[in-house]
Amino acid sequence: MKKNLLQLVLLTILSISANAQYNTMTIPEAYYGTVGANGVTFNLTIKDTVKQFRTGNQTVTGSISSPNVKNNFWGPTLIVNKDDVIHMNVTNNLNEATTIHWHGMHLPAIMDGGPHQVIPSGTLWQPYWTVKNQAATLWYHPHLHQSTQSHVTKGVGGFIIVKDAAEAALAIPRTYGVDDFVMALSSRRFLATTNAMATQLIDNYGDYAMVNGTLNPQVSLPKQVVRLRLLNAEIQRAYNIGFSDNRTFYVIANDDGLLETPIAVTRLPLTTGERVEILVNLTSSTVGSTLDLKAYNSTAEIQLLTPGQSTFGWPGLEGNPTTPTGNNGPINGGLLNNTTFNILHINIAAATTGAITTIPSTLISNTYWTLADVTNTRTITVGGGNGGTAFTLDGALFTTTMVPKAVNLNAVEKWTVVNNNIFGHTFHLHDVPFKIISRSGGNIGTTVRAYEQGWKDSAWLPISGSITFIAKFENYSDSTWPYMYHCHALTHEDEGMMGQFVVNSSLGINQESGTTDFSLYPNPANDKIFINLKDASTEIYYVTITTVTGRVVMMLPQPEWQNGIDISSLASGVYILQMKDKETKSTTTRKFVKK
């Protein structure tokens, strides 16, 4: 084992020395949280920072850090297990409000982190939930309406890896950072005079590709089967993934879990917000050799996927105006637009001890909902975009007060999303995964491609195309806090291409609620404050703690209040605790003193 590790280290050093024009790809910290009596706790801090991307000025960025590693772009990879109860302590130290959405996670709407769960600057948000997802590659990112693009562009986000027993039983790579790698694919534009990243809504496409926030990245991969967890973390660009030697690779999972069998491909479309797990067999590669992961996004390559039409973006492919801006690349365009470009340079290193050397023939068994299970159908239509207007869903632009669609708890619904529009889009659904059952139009035929036949939460909508999927809205209901559905091109969602829905339960609608009267003790308090309910039948829906001037310092959705609320991080002073009742949604406030 020591010999193999030494070989790997030496080959990595030699490869880096021989490829000085490349930068070593950042591998985000694997963060397992802290195990306690009530579950697993993750402490995450969002902050403004800087990163040296290019020669000259540093670039102002944003990041998410754990207590272990202080990042300057992107955040740690959260490793969780199915059935874990996880507690998130999210502190927003940006100079502005934001949110954190747990993309792909099945959880209560009040914990979802969409545009409704705003975290003001200087505030601690404490959602928690039981992990019900099967093994999958998920991610987390800001979702503040009209600020999602700018916050993601700055680098705020990270991966979530969910593990379970079914995945653990498979003979596939799973040693993080050795034969199992997360890779967030994106690109950025930099202003020529300051090196600042372009974050305006018109900055849809980057000029320089990066992986995990690393420009011109390279990585050493062992001579064996490796697992790459790919995320399209772009603002708007889609990728047509392949390798420079046109090798076959194998799709084993998409957005929300493993497939039944590996799917062999040489090209793989990946649109914004989508994730895919692939296996690459490097056993026949020569140690010291190289290859590249590429985006085959040239006009000719794209039209191989959809004859006579672009796969991504406008009918004339990605935006490619000729008007220069004085920065890098054309306005609303990018130096990479309509081209085939390198994503990642790969150096082949020695195999590790216990290496996986074959691709499995089968994976897991999934049980999907069928048309026979459907209790309701819906059609959503994409509109807008003409003459520079914002894109819409069902003719409306999003507001937090718009009337949500109402879904019944445990309903199995069939949704058809129709894109008779001038642009391609990615449709993303919060709360639950869906199963695509058909496609139509868009020059891609009606067959759902094999690599997208698993559980999805994001799906590509080509121009003049539509998708139909089935989803079951189970486990969580909340008539107050909605979930979202929207285009995952960040510029489009920021402009209002979003809708919302609530999941209603028929139970408890007429249930009588207890009084919301309560007291706090001890008062003054030092480390914890306790709530004493006058009526034990009262259910606490939300607790917010503010200063006497109204600044929010703590947000606790459906708190586990019985063992006290931890206020040890608060400065000494007078605070106001606001408690919202679950049934009536009425709010009652009490003052307390922090010693």
Where are the model-predicted features located?
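Histidine-centered copper-binding motifs that mark active-site loops
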Residues: Q21-N281, T311-N366, A372, R378-G384, ...
